[in-house]
Amino acid sequence: MPAIRRFGTLRPVLAVLLLLAKVQSIEDHFSTQPEITNHLDRSEDTMADNSSSLDAQFVSQSNSFATKLYQRISAKHAGENVVISPFSISACLSLAAMGAGGLTAEQMYSVLEFGAPDRKQTVADNYRRLMERLATDSTVNVANKIYVMQNYAVKGAFNAIATGSFRSEAESVNFAESAAAAKKINGWVEEKTNNKIKDLISPDALDELSRMVLVNAVHFKGTWTYQFDPSLTRPFPFWLSETESRDVPMMNIKKHFAFNNFEELGFSALELTYGGSDMTMMLLLPNERMGLAALEEKLPTLNLAELAGKMHKQEVEVFLPKFKIEFTRDLNEDLQALGMERMFSDSAEFPDLLEQNEPLKVSKVVHKAFIEVNEEGTEAAAATAAVVRVKRALINRLKVRLDHPFLYALMMGSSRQTAFVGRLVKPDQSDVTQANRHEEL
């Protein structure tokens, strides 16, 4: 029997790319522009506010956007494993919104749930606080980058917000040399995501009309507060339907975890924590074997922070499948369906991005995410349970079997802002041969 390897952690990784292009093809006649400024203009902001706490409304708005985007994407990928980072997508779009105007700005702020464009400074301040807080968490790496067509310059006010609130840096590239430009962008993304996200952008997405590429990359690698013992990981059935199952590597641990069975809502919730981080993973397990669709329909009415407040620490024996998910999606259609249409049209307004007075529009928004969950921890997450997977074995003793499709969310801090969200419906069968056949649980 092959030796069981003690490696890996729970690691969610994702990257979002937003590509802005020139609206129409006309002969370029701009001379070389001044270098992009790197100073932070504080004349019109409120950076003097030393508060490190996030606005509760900002968190609520962010989670609302996360829910509606997840519902849209998951509906388009029925029966598939899904993982996205609403935080990464929102951060990238929010940065672009800082340079938008007119109806374009109105639609972007509305879809992102931030209200109206007059909330611009409030949004920027909240991102500044969030980025400052995440910078102190060694398990999380958040990076933003702006790539600008050579001989073009970012406007000073936009650059001040980009560097001050989003900690983004700008770099000049020649998009006309598409292969070299794509290689540079993809190389940066790979570096920031520990080589988990590759080939985010293809060369054919870039050309001489490309003006700016905004990229957000997030990498989380957390070790469980209570690690699963690899010697207890064994093959166990995971139900794909009411009658079909497959054996998958099922991890096992018995510790005190925050838990509650919300019977009136039809699901149970379990929260796992990570050492040295305020990130947590919440697992939502339908009480019915095939109850995932019903649970997903309830998402808009669920407040994860409130759910967490109703959970109680108790001894729970947990059976959680190991899994790894990679997910890529072009978000153009999803964002337009949600109401963010104008930024993709020739009528798009982005007057505050570049010094050059040139019409710009968004040509592509791409999202790529990766997650892995094993005995040691996470690098992106997902989980599932079976028919009445949460049941009492003895008095004050719970057994939670995530052996059927379930939802999971990686959340940040006590505010429970959603960083990653997804579902597990078909765990990988890899590594099953490395585990002993599980006895009847």
Name each region found by the language model.
Residues 2-3, 7-10, 21, 34-46, ...:
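Non-catalytic interaction/Regulatory regions outside core domains
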Residues 300:
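Catalytic and substrate-binding regions of extracellular carbohydrate-active enzymes
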Residues 2-176, 436-441:
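Detector for small/aliphatic-rich hydrophobic stretches
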